[in-house]
Amino acid sequence: MGQTFIVFTPTNDMRALHPAEVVFFRYCAERKQWEVILSTQLPVVLRRGMTAEQIIKYSPCFVQIHQSYIINIDYLMIIKDNKCMLYPPFDNVTELFVSRKYKKELQDRFCL
């Protein structure tokens, strides 16, 4: 299942999250902040300064697929045309493309 971990919001509030609650993380270049999309489909903005390297250390199920995206592989259904398709009700998410830089790591990790 994975250990609960703590993230900080921009207002310095601490938010406890369980890996199963996290569908994916998205980097907002405009704000220069990561946000986490939860299984409730609500986004939680993370404090500035958080890096992808820090995020993927929270759980082995968090995998970076693009400079701006980290997914929870437990929600991954299929990769089609370099696009991650998630299990319902997240099958309408269309933004999760796997970049060339991260594709090899993803394939190696899952023996694809």
Predicted regions and their residues:
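Basic, polyanion-interacting recognition surfaces, primarily
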Residues: 2-112
